[in-house]
Amino acid sequence: MTELTVNQPLNYRNTGFITSAPDIRHLPQDTGVEIAFAGRSNAGKSSALNRITDQKGLARTSKTPGRTQLINMFEVTQGCNLIDLPGYGFAQVPLELKIKWQKALGEYLQKRECLKGLVVLMDIRHPMKDLDQQMIFWAIESRLPVLVLLTKADKMKSGARKAQLLKVRESSKSFGGDVQIELFSSLKGIGLDQVRRKLDTWFGPELERQLMLAAAENGETYTGESLSDKSDD
């Protein structure tokens, strides 16, 4: 009997780069499940992706914030992709380019059908800037769940970061929608397991869909927990 399960956590160490695109029109086919990562240019987005996948060089970190202008796609497993969106809000980027990026980000959040969750990263010392809030509003308008990561949590002492977490959680209630706030540190691994569990939850329906297709192709019955061969009944 062949047994397949949807409950086992994904191995994010297997994540690999697929492609880069200047906008939504140049992305691969709109299928599977995508989880997007967004944040200001100095929020530590690339470092977070590298820590989540346990790969130091997966997402390129730049010493010049605002340099990454492309949408970068990474595959965790078939049909499950992580999307690294261009950083926003860096002062030295020309206004015309800022407007172009913001338009591309809004278009992606509102029109990409396979997008099923948004991770917004914010420096814990400077959370909820105007553009951060705009990203969350766009997601809510598109009925997307949002995970806000207060990055660089190691920069604050334990008591101070807990107080900041509670403060941001309280202020986020005004958004409505599904918005979860958590602490995160790429350096210390704070919040790492929580992020991976959330990603597993968001990817779950796609993995279940694949199991159902595999069951049909192999003459098996999908029970919701595993696939059991009919011939063994």
Curated annotation (Swiss-Prot):
Domain (EngB-type G) ranges: 31-205
Positions with a binding annotation for Mg(2+): 46, 68
Cellular component aspect of the GO annotation: cytosol
Binding annotation for GTP: 39-46, 66-70, 84-87, 151-154, 184-186
Alphabetical list of PROSITE patterns matching this protein: G_ENGB
Keywords: Cell cycle, Cell division, GTP-binding, Magnesium, Metal-binding, Nucleotide-binding, Septation
Any single GO BP term: division septum assembly
Keyword GTP-binding carried by entry: yes
Superkingdom field: Bacteria
Pfam short name (any one): MMR_HSR1
Requisite cofactors: Mg(2+)
Molecular functions (GO terms): GTP binding; metal ion binding
HAMAP family xrefs: GTPase_EngB (MF_00321)
Family affiliation: Belongs to the TRAFAC class TrmE-Era-EngA-EngB-Septin-like GTPase superfamily. EngB GTPase family.
Function: Necessary for normal cell division and for the maintenance of normal septation.
Name recorded for this polypeptide: Probable GTP-binding protein EngB
Organism from which the protein derives: Photobacterium profundum (strain SS9)
Originating gene: engB
